[in-house]
Amino acid sequence: MFGLKAKSTKKVLGSIPKHIGIIMDGNGRWAKKRLKPRVFGHKAGMDALQEVTITASELGVKVLTVYAFSTENWSRPQDEVSFIMNLPVAFFDKYVPVLHENNVKIQMIGETSRLPEDTLAALNAAIDKTKRNTGLILNFALNYGGRAEITSAVRFIAQDVLDAKLNPGDITEDLIANYLMTDHLPYLYRDPDLIIRTSGELRLSNFLPWQSAYSEFYFTPVLWPDFKKAELLKAIADYNRRQRRFGKV
């Protein structure tokens, strides 16, 4: 049940996007500004994610997909990669209880084969603990790359055609969507209404290229660890000033 404050905020904001995607960028620069190592920024970003998730849940957002680690991030320094891979363990250990209390359901997209065993175990434990929750879906994009996702979908479709499970004429946009990693999401909420990128960068970086065809984009110079409740509300207010046409006049 929403509190009076949450209801009032929703009324002021107007329409709430059902699916928000966030490219969480700027952790390293945030740490550098404070003369700290990059990993310090990643840890602060973990706390920002918890606050944004709870806020989105209170507002009635259905899906929050966060770009936690891309397939390209493996090229970063090994000590940083190792730290980032341990972040889900720390995040779930610290925040799963409060997320569970708020009816948040944890899911993920991405290739799991390269994930360390303890990272995968923590992720699976969080997914299992929250699997019966019916509130916001916190969808981690972990070792995710949009082009790789589409390539994998094409391979599976081609194999099903070869196996006579599909005819080429059966291939539609909806069918392709069913082969993507987001097929586990509720059908009406698979594609983000709003994609937010922090830190001032103006690109998608291989994040949900298929699903974002008609998304609205919000770019902010705010670094991710500083992106808290007020910044999310500002992004949603900006979203509400736009008219979504989906290619129409």
UniProtKB/Swiss-Prot annotation:
One annotated GO biological process: polyprenol biosynthetic process
Keywords (A to Z) from UniProt: Magnesium, Metal-binding, Transferase
Domain of life, per lineage: Bacteria
InterPro entries reported for this sequence: UPP_synth-like (IPR001441), UPP_synth-like_CS (IPR018520), UPP_synth-like_sf (IPR036424)
UniProt GO molecular function: ditrans,polycis-undecaprenyl-diphosphate synthase [(2E,6E)-farnesyl-diphosphate specific] activity; magnesium ion binding; manganese ion binding
Positions bound to substrate: 26-30, 38, 42, 70-72, 74, 76, 197, 203-205
PROSITE patterns for the chain: UPP_SYNTHASE
Residues reported in the UniProt entry to bind Mg(2+): 25, 216
EC number: 2.5.1.-
Cofactor: Mg(2+)
Pfam family, one: Prenyltransf
GO cellular component: cytosol
Catalytic residues of the enzyme: 25, 73 (proton acceptor)
Enzyme type, top EC level: transferase
Record's cofactor remark: Binds 2 magnesium ions per subunit.
Record-stated family: Belongs to the UPP synthase family.
HAMAP family: ISPT
Function summary: Catalyzes the condensation of isopentenyl diphosphate (IPP) with allylic pyrophosphates generating different type of terpenoids.
Subunit structure: Homodimer.
Protein name from the UniProt record: Isoprenyl transferase
